[in-house]
From Swiss-Prot:
Testis-specific (at protein level). This is Phosducin-like protein 2. Essential for male fertility, spermiogenesis and acrosome formation. Disruption phenotype: Male mice are infertile, show severe defects in spermatogenesis and exhibit lower testis weight, epididymis weight, sperm number and malformed and immotile sperm. Show dramatic abnormalities in acrosome formation and in proper sperm head and tail development. It is found in: Endoplasmic reticulum.
Amino acid sequence: MQDPNEDTEWNEILRNFGILPPKEEPKDEIEEMVLRLQQEAMVKPYEKMTLAQLKEAEDEFDEEDIKAIEIYREKRLQEWKALKKKQKFGELREISGNQYVNEVTNAEKDLWVVIHLYRSSVPMCLVVNQHLSVLARKFPETKFVKAIVNSCIEHYHDNCLPTIFVYKNGQIEGKFIGIIECGGINLKLEELEWKLSEVGAIQSDLEENPKKGIADMMVSSIRNISIYDSDSSGSDTEAK
């Protein structure tokens, strides 16, 4: 179908006979600016204000505006509360053993809590703390805490460290005990993020396990070794 705004002789004839409407002229920058200013003028002044500014300027509005302001203020307040609730945490906090029950087991309803039991003398624990600090900032809706293991469990063996527990509504929904379960000595941030997302503690945007590629390479290498071993065995048999 032919574009009615296209500059063709046929379209011009149709315009002259009134069959097509006059061609729309492109708006220049000044006209665009005027339109934008007109649209901005239609916005009520209070719609650009913060809650604090609304409080200071409320004497300057008429009765009709005040009613609208109350509705608008309530809307802004609810948006602010929702944002604060979502961004409630945002850091890896240190707690002691006597805070465990209140901070972890009895945390508020439907809240995910990730706790890391650690010792500073265990290098892998320091790696996990570093990764959890990053994840706490990335997922502020989840509570991330750490505690020196001696303050929570006496005589806990170093072989069981790092230990990560994931709680929700007082129940352990996931646990990673020891270096292997936590992801190995070369644990990457994305790998720990994947582990926590698998148990539901965070909503990650990772689409697959970051370690999958490494695992596939290892399987491929093992298969290649097996093939070479088979070829070698066959050659030895023929030689005999």
